[in-house]
Amino acid sequence: MATKKKKSLVPSFPPEPRPNPNLFVCTPMYGGMATGYYVQSLIQLPSTLQAHGCNMGYSAMFNESLIQRGRNALVHTFLPKKEFTHLMFIDADIKFNAADLVKMIQADKDIIAGIYPKKEINWGGVKAAVDRGEPVEDWKKRTGSLVINLKDYANTVTVPVDQPVEVNCAGTGFMLIKRETFEKMEPFVRKYKNDVGFIDGGIGAEEIIEYFACDIEPGTERLLSEDYYFCWRAREAGLKVWAAPWASLGHFGTYLFEGGLLPAP
């Protein structure tokens, strides 16, 4: 005779739906100055996010010459604002497409960054394009040296452009970070007492978590910039860093134009 299965007295509930992502955009803005390309891109962002059910907050850090301290202060501002699920660093010299950022949110990664060129011209890349006989209109694409350290792509820069790619390090100039990422990283980083003017204009004595710093990487003995340091600490915490190859970014900078008449052969 089959035994009747006892009914569980513990009520079951459907899983709670995940809240819509809400973005807190942070910009270190030395001198309080931003490029027109950044401003033009930023203006398009709120409406694009709202069309996808996302709200947006914003904070900028003026006149902080020490970039790692500026980024730490911006994270310190973000953390108590529990309504925001993601912090998005966008530097004031970056040109971006808001739709690319939406796709970065949808990728659902702990850390994902856009790939942008350094403020230098990769003349070697241009020469290689000329030697290969590439069309003149494509030479511009070869001028950039990218702010990225690829993982498992040591001998190639060919990656799938429509999906996230795992990297060792990426620049923080266009980086999306989940709130949970900071919580997971906290045991792996230090804290310090703030002794400078804070974002609201006051002098705060708050204890600030040092997610960003410059340090020497064990093993390689490389001096890490604040963004590569952040990625290193994230990997120590068991997290992965991803790049968004689909993000089309510009990095605005000044350039000294030089030239003159050449002597006759």
Question: For each predicted feature, which ranges?
Answer:
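Residue-level detector of anion-binding/catalytic polar loops
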Residues: 55, 93, 110, 240-242, ...
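Short beta-strand-to-loop acidic/aromatic patch adjacent to the donor-nucleotide binding site
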Residues: 83-95
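Conserved donor sugar-nucleotide recognition element shared by glycan-biosynthetic enzymes
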Residues: 67-71, 139, 227
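N-proximal low-complexity "stem/linker" segments adjacent to membrane-targeting elements
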Residues: 1-65, 69
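Conserved catalytic core of nucleotide-sugar-dependent glycosyltransferases
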Residues: 75, 97-214
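Active-site nucleotide-sugar/metal-binding loop of Leloir-type enzymes
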Residues: 72-86
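C-terminal catalytic/acceptor-binding lobe
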Residues: 2-24, 187-265
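Anion (oxyanion) recognition and catalysis
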Residues: 50, 105, 235
